[in-house]
Amino acid sequence: MNKNRMKSLKEDYKHFAFTLLAVSTFLYIGAVLPDQGLTLGQKSTMFLADCVFLAGAFFCADRSLIYKKRLEEADE
């Protein structure tokens, strides 16, 4: 894999991680705010979706770090 492709993947995964983290933050705030008229099932669904988005953010951040290390190894 060439350096430009790895650099592009590193940046893409970093952007995905930040986007997923932002979405999960808004979902968490929406689930935690009181008196929104949400049922227990809806809150549970929002917390589950929040966990999925956080897991995706951690996965993307990890992939970004992997490509960063590969780029550093390729430079040596």
From Swiss-Prot:
Q: Which UniProt keywords apply?
A: Cell membrane, Membrane, Transmembrane, Transmembrane helix
Q: This protein's superkingdom?
A: Bacteria
Where do the TM regions start and end? 16-33, 45-61
Topological category with respect to the lipid bilayer:
Multi-pass membrane protein
Q: Where in the cell is it found?
A: Cell membrane
GO cellular component annotations of the record: plasma membrane
Q: What is its main location?
A: membrane
Q: What is this protein called?
A: Uncharacterized protein YrhC
Ranked from the top, the taxonomy reads:
Bacteria, Bacillati, Bacillota, Bacilli, Bacillales
